[in-house]
Amino acid sequence: MCRTLAAFPTSCLERAKEFKTRLGIFLHKSELGSDTGSVGKFEWGSKHSKEGKNFSEDVLGWKESFDLLLSSKNGVAAFHAFLKTEFSEENLEFWLACEEFKKLRSATKLGSRAHRIFEEFICSEAPKEVNIDHETRELTRTNLQAATAVCFDAAQWKVRALMEKDSYPRFLKSPAYRDLATQATAASASPSSSSPAEPLHT
């Protein structure tokens, strides 16, 4: 939901334009992106490759469930671009940090990484403090005394639930995603087309 200009340095309209720009840059930098130099263009349905079709299916899958969005590298990148316009990218960054943390096998690395994540996202006045309740924060602090791969599970679940309930629906309703989904739908319907999609309007 848009807040007052006193709360944010940019208006809702400017934030929407910023998301489109970020998403366009994301597409352009993607390995699947157009090499024309135009931001927001994409080779959706090249007859010489299945990559365009696969990407369009990926895009359409993002609205099926939050799990599918988070399991897609492109989806995470697009969602992160959107969250930056809402000044809430720390939620996704924390979730991703927890996912990487769980992959660690060294007890020494677990301990040091756990403290870095706590200092960056969990403790009061953290530079990227996420919105969790006091009880969850203190539980996580206690877990750090003997850090394991699951010591952030409670906090990660709370943040994920917040994103799924709050940010994810707004992402799906955003003009930029709807434009992208429209292009993806058209590409899926015409897989043999080699014409680039229309650029996102900014």
Curated annotation (Swiss-Prot):
A lipid is attached at C2, C12 (S-palmitoyl cysteine). SUPFAM superfamilies: Regulator of G-protein signaling, RGS. One of its GO terms (cellular component) is cytoplasm. Disulfide bonds: none annotated. Residues 65-181 form the RGS domain. The keyword Coiled coil does not apply. InterPro entries: RGS, RGS_sf, RGS_subdom1/3, RGS_subdomain_2. Residues 183-202 are annotated as: Disordered. The modification Phosphotyrosine is found at Y168, Y177. It is found in: Membrane. GO terms for molecular function: GTPase activator activity. Keywords: GTPase activation, Lipoprotein, Membrane, Palmitate, Phosphoprotein, Signal transduction inhibitor. The keyword Phosphoprotein applies. Palmitoylated on Cys-2 and/or Cys-12. Its main location: membrane. It is a lipid-anchor. Interacts with GNAI1 and GNAQ. Interacts with GNAI3, GNAI3 and GNAO1. This is Regulator of G-protein signaling 16. It comes from Bos taurus.
